[in-house]
């Protein structure tokens, strides 16, 4: 419509990055999957205006994984980040950082629980 991509489709960029999913006005919008060619990172979930937005799963090339909410392309809201070394954080994120109520459990069993601000535990409980 008007020369813009709308509906289901696939777009492969010259750098090898690939998106399969819904488009609105030539932007990623709705459900889709993006694969980044340079390192194999994938995102499966919701998009809005070309950005990860809503519920999704981001699996990084090294195996780390985030499952949860995104806003404007960043981890934002409730989510779980699991590192390949066995560490796990379950809680709130803001602008890609641990921020709000959350629990960080290390692979060795050590637990940090409480209020987080800008990736730091500031009020343990």
For each feature predicted by the language model, list its residue ranges.
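Conserved anchor residues at repeat-unit boundaries in beta-strand-based tandem repeats, strongest
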Residues: 1-6, 18-29, 42-53, 65-76, ...
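Threonine-centered tandem repeat motifs in low-complexity domains
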Residues: 5, 10-14, 33-35, 57-61, ...
């Amino acid at each position: 419509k008007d020369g813009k991509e709308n509906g289901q489709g696939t777009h492969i960029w010259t750098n090898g990055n690939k998106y399969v999913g819904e488009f609105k006005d030539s932007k990623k919008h709705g459900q889709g999957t993006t694969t980044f060619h340079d390192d194999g990172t994938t995102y499966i979930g919701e998009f809005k205006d070309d950005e990860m937005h809503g519920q999704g799963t981001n699996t990084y090339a090294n195996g780390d994984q985030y499952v949860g909410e995104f806003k404007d392309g960043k981890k934002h809201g409730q989510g779980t980040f699991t590192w390949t070394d066995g560490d796990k954080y379950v809680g709130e994120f803001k602008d890609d950082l641990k921020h709000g109520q959350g629990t960080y459990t290390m692979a060795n069993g050590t637990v940090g629980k409480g209020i987080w601000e800008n990736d730091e535990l500031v009020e343990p409980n």
